[in-house]
């Protein structure tokens, strides 16, 4: 079981996944984009999304695919903080290549995708996220259109406490007793 949690930047995805990992014991794969930005800012080279969006999206796509393959042997559920769909959506937007072409032959996630809505009260720009809330909304709307077109069923997270969100996710995915 490979579950994708995606949606609006600053929607609380990473914090929610931290709860699912630490409190509920699930394996979690961290967001590829943030890992890439940290590496570049640390001097490891590579593309930043605000300087080279196509190069960044290509790197995020490769990292997301490597992440998926790295946990392919794990039989327990695994949660992904963003992933192939996010990177492919960004690459399609910035390059004009159809997303279906980008994803052709790449692994898929489980049909139900957890979708974080825009949450302005949580959104913060920082050294790793330089874009503003308007850009985050545009990305959210692109993902909202792409998911059903690719055959995924998105389930929108409620704007509730972290523990209530974690319970909602587990219930929505049938992972509770």
Question: Each PLM stretch: what is its role?
Answer:
Residues 95-160:
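A glycine- and Lys/Arg-enriched "phosphate-lid" helix/loop adjacent to the NTP-binding pocket
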Residues 12:
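Conserved glycine(s) of the Walker
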Residues 57-108, 123:
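Glycine-rich phosphate-binding loop used to anchor ATP phosphates in small-molecule kinases
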Residues 22-63:
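Conserved substrate/cofactor phosphate-moiety recognition/catalytic segment
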């Amino acid at each position: 079981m490979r579950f994708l949690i995606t949606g609006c930047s600053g929607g609380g995805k990473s914090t929610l996944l931290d709860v699912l990992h630490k409190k509920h014991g699930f394996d979690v794969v961290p967001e590829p984009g943030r890992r890439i930005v940290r590496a570049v800012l640390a001097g490891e080279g590579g593309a930043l999304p605000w300087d080279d969006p196509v190069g960044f999206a290509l790197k995020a796509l490769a990292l997301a695919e490597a992440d998926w393959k790295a946990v392919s042997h794990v039989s327990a559920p695994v949660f992904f903080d963003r992933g192939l769909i996010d990177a492919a959506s960004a690459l399609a937007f910035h390059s004009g290549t159809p997303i279906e072409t980008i994803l052709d032959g790449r692994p898929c996630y489980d049909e139900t995708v957890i979708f974080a809505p825009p949450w302005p009260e949580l959104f913060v720009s920082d050294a790793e996220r330089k874009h503003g809330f308007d850009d985050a909304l545009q990305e959210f709307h692109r993902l909202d259109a792409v998911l059903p077109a690719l055959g995924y069923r998105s389930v929108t997270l409620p704007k509730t406490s972290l523990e209530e969100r974690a319970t909602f996710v587990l219930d929505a995915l049938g992972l509770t007793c």
